[in-house]
């Protein structure tokens, strides 16, 4: 499975590590992804998703049904 949030689509960012002598080397800044089991009340079941921590915070205010609809995800497949 890829390192990508299943609800927001958040993924790694290309950046540079800059040393004291200003030598720049490429580095990936990965999203903070967590496996999270979320209760889906409409489906009456637990859904296990790989979510960014930002998405977990947004879930608490919006709810899983609204976020899944916005992302175009069918929760029955999880």
Swiss-Prot record:
- Please name the SUPFAM superfamilies in this protein's record: L28p-like (SSF143800)
Does the record carry Ribonucleoprotein as a key word? Answer: yes
State the InterPro entries in the record: Ribosomal_bL28, Ribosomal_bL28/bL31-like_sf, Ribosomal_bL28_bact-type, Ribosomal_bL28_sf
Keyword terms: Ribonucleoprotein, Ribosomal protein
| Residues forming coiled coils | none
GO BP terms, alphabetized: translation
* GO MF terms, alphabetically ordered: structural constituent of ribosome
The cross-references to Pfam families, in alphabetical order and at most eight, read: Ribosomal_L28
- Quote a single Gene Ontology cellular component term: ribosome
* NCBIfam families from the UniProt entry: L28
State the family named in the UniProt similarity comment for this chain.
Answer: Belongs to the bacterial ribosomal protein bL28 family.
Task: Please identify the protein, giving its name as recorded.
Answer: Large ribosomal subunit protein bL28
**What is the scientific name of the source organism?**
Trichodesmium erythraeum (strain IMS101)
